[in-house]
């Protein structure tokens, strides 16, 4: 009898909970959500993504072509809106920028980004605004970027000499440009950030590579963030955290070594002059010493800012440069025109400087066209809705993640003629730029969360590209034809070229010797 009463009580309790949920749901106003594909229990819309393409930006474009430029998806229990037109992007990133100023964090990215406390992934807040202000007014000003001109020129000259030696050695196997260009980018960012080459660089890059692999795919914790069990069983967040701890340890060593060096210089009476390349770390240590910033520049702050510098600057430029070289090999006409412009600008010189490339309009068009076709982040870093709002007549509830498919927008035939073709001339006499105001072309984002390192990334990219075109002609290895180049992309946050780019340099203008370049 007692058992029957217990069962009855339990049944009534369950019924009460269900009725309460039904009543609560009925009392809520029905939302006019954006259209989207049909969903399945638990996984939501995921089956539509995995069935179409390993590159999620391609799958999303295919779905948007059917459901419209603003589309609702469910990533497990996480609501997401996909934006695939300039008009909707402008509404989200400009007119309602503040409402969408937060970041969407997966469980793995949260672990890798210090709990979402770095500049890239931190939520919109006073702290984030002050950290970004330090970046924009102290680390990434035009004057600061120009101050590293000598660093860029020396590192690029070193690469050119290595390639000239490879060309002299002959052979048809080609040079692995992915390795060479990645090393160049990492050396530039290390010297600019901490004042010299870093003995811990390879350790840091190895940990970064592991972290990048973990954030490529969604884990069960990303699909069900409210579930503690999902968080416990998910492997990627744990691996991401382990990688981040390795990277943090390297950065803390670098900071301490620099502090020790500055103390030794001060004790020896060398002072600021010897300390002195005024790298990013030196600037941050000076701000730490002086105090007075709204957010104290603690060692923890220095760690996350250097982390953003290392990871951001060493990723974008080499990815884009590899795509440019691949496209130029597939389009000999554009290659010849770009080479002619560079060689005319620096005729008779054995070394390109940044002063030589200021007026190279066609080179800049080539870079723009590569950014259009191969935006490093095909989906802009996702925003998160801070308050319920409406976009294009549709309700967007608070907490919704918003993904702008810039890859699809940059291939929209309504805005781009022959959108799949590599045609730098489309930017001739065209005011469209990537600074955040032309919403059909936003490779670096727009609004409050636009990439703060645009000028630094472009400076690294332009000089390297100009130098490779100035000194060398290029051919593909082992008799490969341009049409045989694999132009597939890697899946994940960054759409790099899937296969390694191997090319054979043929020296046309011999570089200066190491002694002349120093």
UniProtKB/Swiss-Prot annotation:
- Report the gene name: CYP71Z7
Q: Give the taxonomic lineage as stored in the record.
A: Eukaryota, Viridiplantae, Streptophyta, Embryophyta, Tracheophyta
Quote the record's binding site residues for heme. 451
Q: Does the keyword Heme apply?
A: yes
Catalytic activity line of the entry: ent-cassa-12,15-diene + 3 reduced [NADPH--hemoprotein reductase] + 3 O2 = ent-3beta-hydroxycassa-12,15-dien-2-one + 3 oxidized [NADPH--hemoprotein reductase] + 4 H2O + 3 H(+)
One GO molecular function term of this record is: oxidoreductase activity, acting on paired donors, with incorporation or reduction of molecular oxygen
Q: Keywords in UniProt for this one?
A: Heme, Iron, Membrane, Metal-binding, Monooxygenase, NADP, Oxidoreductase, Transmembrane, Transmembrane helix
Report the record's Gene Ontology biological process terms: diterpenoid biosynthetic process
Q: What is this protein called?
A: Ent-cassadiene hydroxylase
């Amino acid at each position: 009898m007692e058992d029957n009463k217990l069962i009855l009580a339990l049944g009534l309790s369950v019924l009460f909970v269900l009725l309460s949920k039904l009543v609560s749901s009925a009392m809520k106003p029905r939302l006019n959500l954006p259209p989207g594909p049909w969903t399945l229990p638990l996984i939501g819309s995921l089956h539509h993504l995995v069935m179409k393409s390993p590159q999620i930006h391609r799958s999303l474009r295919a779905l948007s072509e059917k459901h419209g430029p603003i589309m609702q998806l469910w990533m497990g229990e996480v609501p997401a809106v996909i934006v695939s037109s300039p008009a909707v992007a402008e509404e989200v990133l400009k007119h309602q920028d503040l409402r969408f100023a937060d970041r969407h964090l997966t469980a793995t990215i949260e672990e890798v980004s210090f709990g979402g406390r770095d500049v890239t992934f931190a939520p919109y807040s006073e702290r984030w605004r002050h950290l970004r202000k330090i970046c924009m007014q102290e680390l990434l000003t035009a004057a600061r970027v120009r101050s590293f001109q000598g660093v860029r020129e020396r590192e690029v000259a070193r690469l050119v000499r290595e390639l000239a030696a490879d060309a002299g050695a002959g052979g048809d196997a080609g040079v692995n440009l992915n390795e060479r260009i990645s090393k160049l980018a990492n050396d530039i960012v290390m010297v600019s950030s901490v004042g010299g080459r870093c003995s811990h660089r390879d350790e840091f890059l190895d940990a970064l590579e592991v972290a990048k692999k973990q954030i490529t795919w969604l884990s069960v914790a990303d699909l069900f963030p409210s579930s503690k069990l999902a968080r416990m069983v998910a492997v990627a967040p744990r691996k991401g955290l382990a990688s981040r701890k390795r990277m943090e340890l390297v950065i803390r060593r670098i900071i301490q070594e620099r502090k020790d060096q500055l103390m030794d210089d001060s004790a020896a009476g060398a002072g600021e002059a010897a300390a002195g390349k005024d790298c990013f770390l030196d600037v941050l240590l000076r701000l730490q010493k002086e105090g007075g910033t709204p957010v104290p520049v603690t060692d923890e702050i220095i760690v996350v800012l250097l982390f953003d510098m290392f990871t951001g600057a060493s990723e974008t430029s080499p990815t884009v440069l590899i795509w440019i070289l691949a496209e130029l090999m597939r389009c000999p006409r554009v290659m010849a025109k770009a080479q002619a412009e560079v060689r005319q600008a620096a005729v008779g010189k054995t070394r390109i400087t940044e002063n030589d490339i200021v007026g190279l309009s066609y080179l800049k068009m080539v870079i723009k066209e590569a950014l259009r076709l191969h935006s490093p982040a095909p989906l802009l870093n996702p925003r998160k809705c801070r308050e319920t709002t409406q976009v294009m007549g549709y309700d967007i509830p608070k907490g919704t993640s918003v993904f702008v498919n810039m890859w699809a927008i940059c291939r929209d035939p309504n805005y781009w003629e022959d959108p799949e073709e590599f045609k730098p001339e489309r930017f001739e006499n065209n005011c469209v730029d990537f600074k955040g105001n032309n919403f059909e072309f936003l490779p670096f984002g727009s609004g409050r969360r636009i990439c703060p390192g645009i000028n630094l990334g472009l400076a690294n990219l332009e000089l390297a590209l100009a130098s490779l075109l100035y000194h060398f002609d290029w051919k593909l290895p082992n008799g490969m034809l341009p049409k045989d180049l694999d132009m597939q992309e890697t899946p994940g946050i960054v759409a790099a070229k899937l296969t390694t780019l191997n090319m054979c340099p043929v020296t046309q203008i011999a570089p200066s010797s190491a002694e002349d370049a120093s």
